[in-house]
A protein has these predicted regions:
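Nudix hydrolase/Nudix homology domain
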Residues: 2-22, 52, 89, 126, ...
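Short beta-strand micro-motifs in enzyme catalytic cores
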Residues: 40-44, 89, 140-142, 168
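Short, solvent-exposed loop/turn elements at beta->coil junctions and helix N-caps
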Residues: 29-32, 128-133
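Acidic, metal-coordinating catalytic segment for phosphate/diphosphate chemistry
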Residues: 25, 29-68, 72-73
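A short coil-to-beta-strand element that immediately follows conserved catalytic motifs
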Residues: 26, 120-127
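Conserved Nudix-box catalytic region and its N-terminal flanking loop in Nudix hydrolases
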Residues: 3-9, 24, 66-111, 153, ...
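Active-site-adjacent beta-strand/loop module that shapes the phosphate/pyrophosphate-binding cleft
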Residues: 45-50, 133-154
Length: 224
């Protein structure tokens, strides 16, 4: 079934969301329940279309970027690092949060590629935009396709600390990486989405990719 055109939904300055069907969702009260180093938790009271008010807890996240770095041999660059919430290392894309004020997402992606994989890229395209888990968080991430890769000289490479100190870097054939997704060996959400998007885009020669500065309406704008 073909996807329909997006509905003509609006959000006014008072925080009232109105859908084209006439349903309204109004935030009547809001407070910050928790502030952490990266995330915060906002507690909203939302008036529903039936007039009732329900509480919604929202994990507020600054947003993130990831990179599918594809070399001339059709291999993707993967990093293997420890993730404490799941208490194990995962195979992932080079990625990071949008934590530098005013930094364009593609520049953040280039920075992460340099810091985590010791690489630069001569060509960048926008691969896919994702809402991580919209039932509980505003976290959104943008995944770029990077090509024409070059290695950063050893003297200029980033010194990694914390979870990144023992990070492993590997290049994996894109088709093999897709197989590892289906086998359950790659489970990181951004990696799954990015790799499958890259494999799909490759089918038509990467001709349908958007420019790196394409509009990103779902990008988080604040931490509270």
């Amino acid at each position: 079934m073909a996807a329909s055109e997006p509905a003509a939904n609006t959000v006014d300055h008072a925080g009232v969301f109105s859908s084209e069907t006439g349903h309204r969702y109004e935030v009547v009260d809001s407070d910050i329940a928790f502030i952490g180093r990266i995330i915060s938790v906002r507690r909203d009271a939302v008036r529903m279309p039936d007039g009732g008010v329900s509480q919604r807890d929202v994990i507020v996240h600054p947003g993130a970027v990831g990179v599918v770095a594809l070399d001339e041999a059709d291999r993707v660059v993967m990093v293997y690092q420890y993730r404490h919430p799941v208490r194990r290392p995962l195979w992932e894309l080079p990625a990071g949060i949008l934590d530098v004020p005013g930094e364009p997402p593609v520049e953040a992606a280039a920075r992460e590629l340099a810091e985590e994989a010791n690489l630069t890229a001569g060509r960048w395209d926008l691969l896919v935009d994702v809402l991580a888990s919209p039932g509980m968080t505003n976290e959104a991430y943008r995944v770029f396709l990077a090509r024409d890769l070059a290695t950063i000289p050893l003297s200029d490479q980033h010194v990694r600390v914390h979870e990144e100190a023992d990070m492993q870097i590997a290049r994996v054939d894109l088709d093999k990486a897709v197989g590892q997704i289906l086998d359950g060996a790659i489970t990181n959400a951004m990696a799954v989405v990015g790799l499958l998007a890259a494999a799909t885009a490759r089918l038509n020669g990467f001709t349908r990719l958007r420019p790196v500065d394409a509009p990103w309406p779902d990008r988080p704008r604040s931490v509270g």
